[in-house]
Amino acid sequence: MGIHEHVEGIKAHWAKNFSFLDYFKKVYGRDKPLPKWTDADVDEFIASDPVYGPQLKAMRESRKFALGGALVGGAHLGGIALKYSKAPHGVVLATGFGAICGAVVGSEVAEHWYQLYKTDKQGANLRFIYWWEDKVAGNQKS
């Protein structure tokens, strides 16, 4: 294996590792941002796309698990801090930390509940962005 093949292998490796930058450029690197969409627009996309629609719907429903986990975690750890510490700054910090931990645990529960590990979450979001861009531009075929 020569140096040229080695360099090409390294380029391919890092191109794969930084492929998420294409997503961020498409979503955030715009001269003129896309207008806000509503829940009705998202529901229209879910109904119109048989592949990515159900995936996007499951991802939207999984937010409830993260929110529930954040509420439970924040209330639990904040309550324990209030019971034993009674220091206001400790209660605030414990509530915040409990909410973060609860949201992470809730997200993991949702990941398995909806089997999101089998889906292409970035692809579904990007497909929705493409669809919304076409709809805003007036190129929607439905």
Curated annotation (Swiss-Prot):
| Assigned keywords, A-Z | Membrane, Mitochondrion, Mitochondrion inner membrane, Tricarboxylic acid cycle
- Which protein is depicted? Succinate dehydrogenase subunit 6, mitochondrial
The main place the protein resides is: mitochondrion
Q: Name one GO biological process term.
A: tricarboxylic acid cycle
Q: Organism, per UniProt?
A: Oryza sativa subsp. japonica (Rice)
Q: Which residues cross the membrane?
A: none
What's the name of its gene?
A: SDH6
Give the metabolic or biological pathway.
Carbohydrate metabolism; tricarboxylic acid cycle
Q: How does it sit in the membrane?
A: Peripheral membrane protein
Q: What subcellular compartments does it reside in?
A: Mitochondrion inner membrane
Its domain of life reads: Eukaryota
Q: What does UniProt give as GO cellular component?
A: mitochondrial inner membrane; outer membrane; respiratory chain complex II (succinate dehydrogenase)
Keyword check for Repeat:
no
Subunit structure and binding partners:
Component of complex II composed of eight subunits in plants: four classical SDH subunits SDH1, SDH2, SDH3 and SDH4 (a flavoprotein (FP), an iron-sulfur protein (IP), and a cytochrome b composed of a large and a small subunit.), as well as four subunits unknown in mitochondria from bacteria and heterotrophic eukaryotes.
- Kindly give the Pfam families that the UniProt entry links to this protein: Rick_17kDa_Anti
